[in-house]
Amino acid sequence: MLADSYLIKFVLRQLQVQQDGDAQHLLMVFLGLLALVTLLQWLVRNYRELRKLPPGPWGLPVIGYLLFMGSEKHTRFMELAKQYGSLFSTRLGSQLTVVMSDYKMIRECFRREEFTGRPDTPFMQTLNGYGIINSTGKLWKDQRRFLHDKLRQFGMTYMGNGKQQMQKRIMTEVHEFIGHLHASDGQPVDMSPVISVAVSNVICSLMMSTRFSIDDPKFRRFNFLIEEGMRLFGEIHTVDYIPTMQCFPSISTAKNKIAQNRAEMQRFYQDVIDDHKRSFDPNNIRDLVDFYLCEIEKAKAEGTDAELFDGKNHEEQLVQVIIDLFSAGMETIKTTLLWINVFMLRNPKEMRRVQDELDQVVGRHRLPTIEDLQYLPITESTILESMRRSSIVPLATTHSPTRDVELNGYTIPAGSHVIPLINSVHMDPNLWEKPEEFRPSRFIDTEGKVRKPEYFIPFGVGRRMCLGDVLARMELFLFFASFMHCFDIALPEGQPLPSLKGNVGATITPESFKVCLKRRPLGPTAADPHHMRNVGAN
C-alpha cells in the first residue's frame, strides 16, 4: 500500500506541472504500474493457495477459462484431463472448479461427508434450499433417509413383495405404451411423446396416484415446461460462474421464464396436495404425497412441526421434492430409452440378438417380466452399453466441499465446484476396449453372465448417488425388452441415421427422429393391445 500511495502522490505532482499530452502519457504509465503492483500483491498473497491447488489452465481475468470451454463443456474437460491429469482445477468466471476423471478418486471422495455439499450459485438460491437434489445439511440427510425408506415400501427394491408392486405399476404403462405404438400401423412415429407419457405415468402413480393420457392438454403443457426448463437451464448456466451476467437482457428474460414455469408447476402440484389433504386417510397411504402428509400430521401431533424439514415451509418442501423427483426421473429415463433406440437403429445385428434371446427365453405368448432379467444377459448388457455410450448426464451433479479437503497432496477449498467427469470414465480407453464402439458384450463375462465393473457409474456414486436407480433399472428393462419383443424398428425411407452427437443441455438428448415399426406378433392373448390395456389396469 505504501508503494501505491507513493505512486499516486508522484503522479499527482507531475500532473500539476505537465501539459495535457504529457499528463495523459503519465496517467497511462501510472495505471500500468498500479496494475502491475496490484498483480504482484495478489500473487504474493495467493501464492500458497495457488501452489496447493490441482494444476490446470489459468484463463483470463474475470471470466477465467469460460471463453475457451465451447458449447460442450464435458468434451473440453476431457481434453483438459488428458493435458493436466485426472485431477485438475480452473476458474470458470469467479468460481474455482475442480474436475475429477478417475473413477477411484470419484468413489473415494463422494463417499466422504465433506463432499455432500452443493455450490452456492444464483440458480441454487432461487430454490431457497428446498427439495432433495439441491438441498444440503440436515434437511438433505433427513429427506434422503425418509425418501429412501418410503420408496422402498412402494417397491423400489429387487427384494420381497415390493418388487411385484412396482412391476405392476410399470407394466400398466408398458401395456399402454405398446398399445399406442400398435396404432401407428407402420407409419413414421416420433417416439418421444409416447415414451414421455408412459414414463411420466409411472412416476405420477408412485408420487400422487395420477396418470395422463397422451392427448391430455395438461400433460402436454407439463411436458413442455420440463423440456423448456432443461433447455433454459443450459442457456443461463453461465450465470452460476459470472453472477453479474444476471443483468444481461437475454439472461434476465430466461430467468424470468424459468420462474414463471416453476410457478405454474408449483400451482399444479399444490392443487394435487390440496386434493390429497381433503381425502387423506392415515390408515390408507396411497402414494408419496400421503406419506408426506402423514409425516406432517405426526409432527404437529408431537409438537415438533416447527423443526420438521429443518424449519422450512412444509408444503413448499413437498412441492419441490415432487418437482425434483419428477423432473429427474422422467427426463433421464425418457432420454435413455431414446438413445437405446438410436443404438438399435445404428446396430441392427445387436437388435436382432436381443430379439432372438427374448424369443428363446420369454417365448412368443407374453411380455418379459423382472423375473426374466437374470436369464437375459444380452438384453441387459445392451441397456448397460447404451447407458455407458450415451452418458446422458456427463458431468453428473456438481458437489461442493463443506470444508477444505486435502486430496492427493492438493487442497480442495470449501465452496469450490467439484465436478465428476462421468463421460470421461465411461469413455476411458484404459478401462474400456475401443470405447467409441457400441459393444454390449463388454458387460458379459466368460460364463455368460452380466458383469458391471465398478467404473460403470451412470447413477453416480457415494452419499448423493441417484435415489431412483432401482426404479430406473426396472423401467429401462421392462420398457425396452417389451418394445423389442413386440416390434422391429427401422428408419423411414430416405432418412439418415440419427447422429451420436446429441443436443447438450441439462442432459444430452438425441436429435429428433422418427421410426417405422413392424409388429412382431405375440400369441393370441398378448397380441391384442386392448386386452393388454385391460390386463395392465387390473
UniProtKB/Swiss-Prot annotation:
Its EC number is 1.14.-.-. It is found in: Endoplasmic reticulum membrane; Microsome membrane. It is a single-pass membrane protein. One of its GO terms (molecular function) is iron ion binding. Gene3D superfamilies: Cytochrome P450. Its cofactor is heme. Heme binds at C466. Induction: By 20-hydroxyecdysone during the three larval stages, at pupariation and in pupae. GO terms for cellular component: cytoplasm; endoplasmic reticulum membrane; intracellular membrane-bounded organelle. InterPro entries: Cyt_P450, Cyt_P450_CS, Cyt_P450_E_grp-I, Cyt_P450_sf, Cytochrome_P450_fam2. The chain crosses the membrane at residues 24-44. Expressed in body wall (epidermal and muscle cells) and mid- and hind-gut. Keywords: Developmental protein, Endoplasmic reticulum, Heme, Iron, Membrane, Metal-binding, Microsome, Monooxygenase, Oxidoreductase, Transmembrane, Transmembrane helix. It is an enzyme of class 1 (oxidoreductase). GO terms for biological process: chorion-containing eggshell formation; ecdysteroid catabolic process; imaginal disc-derived leg morphogenesis; metamorphosis; organic acid metabolic process; prepupal development; pupation; xenobiotic metabolic process. Belongs to the cytochrome P450 family. Probably involved in steroid hormones biosynthesis. This is Cytochrome P450 18a1. It comes from Drosophila melanogaster (Fruit fly). The gene is Cyp18a1.
